[in-house]
């Protein structure tokens, strides 16, 4: 027999947890379903960056107020309590394969002197954040069901939505799909039929200590050219919120760890490295949905977007969707018109805010240049560029800085000029699709941004 609710939420990550908290506070009879037994335990690799403080992101000017321990979303008009550990970082440095040349996004030396005012952003404990959101949800009457693998979502004859999983059936007037980039809700409800699938990006992440890196409080990314391999590998190093000597260290595959730490030009950074814990991840990449609504199912966060909507973007979606559903039920409009405010907000804040294809620049940038070309290219940047963590902007910031140097590049390394033409918005989608066809996204995949 079905358990009946105003709202059934699938997924207890940032989007689902925020939707549950909001719905509970609004007095909706709500159930949240989660496949993990402990939703606040982070079992998937995640950098846990606050994305982003440096710019408008998804039409929001978000930031963390460390004085009152709140994440602030002033455009959308809400805050989120967070009193767990944090750690600032002050720049993003992209290193060349030789380990010497680098492209600095932000003046690390100057920014670190300014403390909180100079930070590019910060990292925090995602598990602590989820724990607080879900505690508030349950306190306000939300029923949480863990260990539930959803195996069906469909519209009922009476206009509601039925969700099945773990031998149980849950029926809601509305359903929110908050189950990530590989959303089962999106698949079951047919959202993906009109989307383009760009590939799946697996990765391996480590929390490590004992590093000796040039910029200890910065995000560092680098390419490495392993001998006798088809594609270069790469890595991310990001400060960890759990200790000043701890870092998040991510790469495409487990076999890259030994090469990067023992044989690469960066090996001196890792002479005393110690692995504390290890996590894996897989992120599916789809073009965004045309509309995050179908038959009383609303998608939030990663499930509707390309790659990842970040923790922050997912929370914004969850809150907006739950409030829209509340209004729809109060107005006795349990249909699309009732939740039109969420649909319109999502379109304005996500696909209309910026072209998602700008976020695709990371993938070809990592593979399309030879080792010699990459070393040369990154040696051209003599001064720090604009400080940004925004994946929509970073490609454009680099292109704008390169523009005055193209005549020099044409003379000194003409092969680069032709390759740089690929990094244009109208060409990039086909490049990524070609990478999927070639097997690149399986062999040398990308990693989530935050």
Q: Model features per residue range: what roles?
A:
Residues 251-280, 289-291, 298, 330-349:
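Flavin-binding catalytic cores
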Residues 36-38, 132-269, 305:
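Predominantly flavin-linked oxidoreductase catalytic cores and closely associated redox partners
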Residues 3-32:
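N-terminal Rossmann-like FAD-binding beta1-loop-alpha1 element of flavoenzymes
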Residues 306-325:
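A conserved FAD-binding loop/helix module that cradles the flavin
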Residues 22, 35-99:
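N-terminal FAD cofactor-binding segment of flavoenzymes
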Residues 290, 323-374:
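Active-site-proximal substrate-binding core of FAD-dependent oxidoreductases
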Residues 279-306, 351, 355, 365-371:
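FAD-binding beta-loop-beta segment adjacent to the flavin cofactor pocket
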Residues 365-450:
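C-terminal auxiliary extensions adjacent to catalytic cores
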């Amino acid at each position: 027999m079905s358990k009946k609710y105003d709202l059934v939420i699938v997924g207890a990550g940032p989007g689902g947890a925020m939707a549950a908290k909001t719905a509970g506070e609004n007095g909706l009879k709500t159930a949240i379903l989660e496949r993990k037994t402990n939703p606040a335990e982070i079992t998937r690799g995640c950098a846990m960056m606050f994305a982003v403080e440096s710019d408008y992101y998804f039409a929001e000017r978000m930031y963390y107020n460390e004085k009152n321990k709140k994440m602030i979303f002033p455009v959308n008009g809400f805050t989120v309590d967070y009193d767990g550990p944090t750690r600032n970082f002050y720049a993003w440095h992209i290193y060349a394969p030789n380990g010497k040349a680098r492209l600095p996004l932000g003046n690390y030396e100057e920014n670190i002197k300014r403390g909180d005012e100079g930070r590019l952003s910060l990292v925090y404990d995602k598990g602590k954040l989820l724990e607080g959101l879900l505690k508030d949800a349950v306190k306000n009457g939300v029923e949480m069901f863990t260990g539930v693998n959803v195996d069906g979502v469909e519209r009922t004859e009476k206009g509601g939505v039925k969700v099945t999983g773990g031998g149980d059936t849950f029926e809601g007037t509305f359903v929110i799909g908050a189950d990530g980039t590989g959303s089962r809700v999106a698949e079951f409800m047919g959202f993906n039929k009109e989307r383009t699938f760009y590939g799946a990006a697996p990765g391996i992440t480590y929390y490590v200590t004992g590093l000796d890196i040039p910029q200890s409080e910065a995000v560092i990314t680098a390419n490495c050219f392993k001998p006798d391999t088809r594609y270069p590998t790469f890595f991310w190093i990001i400060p960890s919120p759990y200790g000043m000597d701890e870092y998040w260290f991510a790469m495409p595959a487990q076999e890259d760890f030994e090469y990067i730490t023992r044989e690469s030009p960066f090996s001196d950074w890792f002479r005393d490295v110690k692995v504390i814990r290890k996590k894996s991840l897989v992120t599916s990449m789809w073009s965004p949905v045309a509309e995050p609504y179908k038959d009383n199912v609303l998608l939030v966060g990663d499930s509707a977007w390309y790659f990842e909507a970040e923790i922050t973007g997912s929370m914004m979606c969850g809150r907006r969707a739950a409030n829209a559903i509340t209004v729809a039920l109060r107005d006795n409009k349990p249909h699309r018109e009732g939740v039109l405010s969420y649909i319109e907000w999502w379109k304005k804040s996500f696909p209309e805010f910026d072209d998602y294809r700008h976020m695709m620049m990371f993938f070809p940038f990592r593979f399309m240049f030879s080792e010699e070309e990459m070393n040369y290219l990154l040696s051209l940047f003599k001064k720090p560029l604009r400080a940004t963590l925004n994946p929509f902007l970073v490609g454009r910031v680099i292109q704008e800085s390169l523009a005055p140097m193209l005549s020099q590049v044409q003379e000194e390394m003409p092969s680069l000029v032709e390759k740089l033409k690929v990094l244009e918005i109208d060409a990039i989608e086909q490049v990524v699709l070609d990478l999927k066809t070639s097997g690149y996204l399986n062999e040398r995949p990308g990693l989530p941004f935050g």
